[in-house]
Amino acid sequence: MVSERSLDVLRAIVQDYVSSCEPVGSKSIVERHSFGVSAATIRNDMALLEEEELIAAPHTSSGRIPTDKGYRLFVDHLAEARPLSPAQRTAIEILLGQSVDLDDVLSRTVRLLSQLTNQTAIVQYPSLSRSRIRHIELVSLAPRRLLSVLITDSGAVEQRVIELTDELAEADIAEIRGAINGAAAGLSLADAAVRLSELPDALADRARALVAPVASALLDQIAANRQDRLMMAGAANLVRTGDDFPSSITPVLEAIEEQVVLLRLFDEMAHDQHSVAVSIGRENDGFGLTEASVMSSGYSSAGADIARVGLIGPLRMDYSGNMAAVRAVARYLSRLLGD
């Protein structure tokens, strides 16, 4: 059974190790923290923590460092809520508030989060498969060429050029625009695809001939853009903390490059009920990231989570500060997309 003081000792070990990158001994704990007990008493507490596999001794030191289990207990029960400073909040509002479109806001988001945390920041694009169609615009580029602009409720804008066999007048384009928006606007991508596939058969001969090629092209456009993807910033931070990956930093770099692993992990984190989900060390074994920690929070549009934003870094990270930054950025991103 771990006592309250032993838990306070664990908190001190995590905080001191994160800040110093040096194993923590009983003497330094007594010197840095106000426990009011002797170093011998602290050593007894550390022995209990080691028995519970919450701390461990590196081979080259008499001090102790947190284990994955120790970090988990810290994150779940000991990490103190640390709000961002007014200056940090102002920086978020100014930088993200200047965004001009979805790509720009996500690019600014990862750069800002990386700067706030000194970690590699990750943001997931809103999945079109979870989005709803706000509007489909058709613009004439030439008599037999249209530009289709698919706009979703998450702010995503997808464009595609449609080549036609017959020339279309402006009145024809207006008729097609009205038909496809009447069928698809307000629906999820999956439901819209069904309605668009059925639409030509529900129209009279002339209207069917006009709408069918455009509906077919829109179906291809929807199918091509339903793959999730990530945007990242701050990968250089991983290189600077390379010593925190004892075996190899390669699996982390490969996960960043290939994205599939992180997308799977983000999908799993979406089921976590905490405002910021944190996956630590061996908890990432199925993803090959046993020497890394990943944290993320969902961001929303129209009241529903549409994707996640977070970061990846070594086990030795400032969990309290990083969780506060991820939470704040996700909330502001949600407000921005909800406008």
From Swiss-Prot:
It comes from the Bacteria. PANTHER family: HEAT-INDUCIBLE TRANSCRIPTION REPRESSOR HRCA (PTHR34824:SF1). Negative regulator of class I heat shock genes (grpE-dnaK-dnaJ and groELS operons). Prevents heat-shock induction of these operons. SUPFAM superfamilies: GAF domain-like (SSF55781), Winged helix' DNA-binding domain (SSF46785). It comes from Leifsonia xyli subsp. xyli (strain CTCB07). The keyword Hydrolase does not apply. Pfam families: HrcA. This is Heat-inducible transcription repressor HrcA.
